[in-house]
Amino acid sequence: NKGAKKLSTKEKILARLKAAKNVLSGETLAQELGVSRTAIWKAIKELEKKGYQIQHSANGYRYQASDILDAKEIHEGIHQDVDITVLETSTSTMKDAQQAVMDGKRSPLLIVADMQEAPRGRFNRPFFAAKQQGIYMSLLLEPKEQLTELPQYTILMAVAVSEAIDELLGVDTQIKWVNDIYLNHKKIVGILSEAMTDIETNSLKYIIIGMGINFSIPQENYPDELQEKATSLFPNGQATITRNQLIINIWNRFFNLLADQTTYLDAYRKKSFVLGKKITFKRKDQSYMGTAIAITDTGELVVDLGEEKVHLSSGEISLSSIQ
């Protein structure tokens, strides 16, 4: 049961405007909510400052759908009881989640940022972010399983994100082992997960799963070096769904897959575009080339080098051709 919070005047006005078919006058809102018309006007101004688009006319106010990250909408949409924090900007939602542990915040906790400054991917590589055109989020989770029985969180998450995008957009995304999601041969999502262990008991305390999703960054806005490598779900900048919808769908799928862990590995294998392909990878500064032939039940990539087969549990692989 989710804890019911008292709505502020601002939240009540927003809910009322969203539900209304027609223009609502300041007088009507004031009477319904039992506040002054000045209070209504001030609350409307605050909502606009936050980025909500509200049309003004002689007859009153009308809500225009806009893509604002809305903690309340996300909280209500996710079937699990997850605390939601929405930030205007963050240096790293992964670091925010680590800080939340230090601050004694309860889990599961989802931190979503409208913009990520100096975002980093795996191997500490920078990636491109844009305000109100991406989704940058991390989930803090306390696993119930023992260390040996843990699901492959990165793989499970990749399936949840990929399937959510496919369903909402009617597209066919693919996964590059281990944690990147591609659309039309270009990267749209990167996923990271890390574990926090209790040093004294050597037990797992928390898992943090983070991701960056290129949502509606116009293709021409990507730097030259990323033009051939990265794209957005809506490269023309015109989104047909909201970020809130995608966030809700992703986490509902994630929690469903987590509850029934029998299906995600097969789904991941089906969506992998590296199986059967020639790949290169580095080990101890030496480059190897082989064919990716399987993904094991523990998420390792099996590569046939000809004279032997090797299992990769992490690291970067390159494909001769993504096509």
Placement of each model-derived feature along the sequence:
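Short, ordered beta-strand-loop transition motifs
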Residues: Q55-A58, K176, I295-T296
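Short loop/turn motifs enriched for small/polar and acidic residues
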Residues: N59, V178, N184
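A short coil-to-beta-strand element that immediately follows conserved catalytic motifs
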Residues: L109, D172-K176
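Glycine-rich beta-strand-to-loop/alpha-helix junction loops that act as flexible
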Residues: D114, V178, I209-I213
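Long, positively charged amphipathic alpha-helical accessory segments at protein N-termini or as interdomain linkers
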Residues: G3-V35, K49, Q146-L147, I155-T173, ...
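Residue-level signal for inorganic ion chemistry
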Residues: I40, T93, M137, D180, ...
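N-terminal lobe of the biotin/lipoate ligase/transferase fold
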Residues: K6-A158, D166, I241
